[in-house]
Amino acid sequence: VILDNQIQIAHNAIIGENTAIAGCTVVAGSAEIGKNCTIAGMVAINGHMKIHDGSVFTGMSMVTKPTKAAGVYSSGIPAQPNRDWHKMNAHIRKLPSVNAKIKQLEQEVAQLKSSAEDK
């Protein structure tokens, strides 16, 4: 086990062999972290969580429910599969243009309604 600085590990927590935990991470009571895991900085793991062997949590992830399988979980509350996080962020980057398109479509619908009412 490799532990960085400023880590809080509460009562009855279990940390599997070859697991690395970076600084400013908190592990609440009775959490169970598997073998060969990587926990990046500022991760918070709620109590009684089970983390599967080989799991990776990127920085600032908050683990609020047990993992269903090993994988890479990324930033956010709660932590989620990395692939889902990337998809969500791709959509977030498109929000300004999507919002502009919606406003344009709303104006077109309003004009069509107005034209239909005039007839």
What are these regions (language model features)?
Residues 1-81:
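Structural signal for interior beta-strand "rungs" in well-ordered beta-sheet cores
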Residues 80-119:
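Long, leucine- and charge-enriched amphipathic alpha-helices
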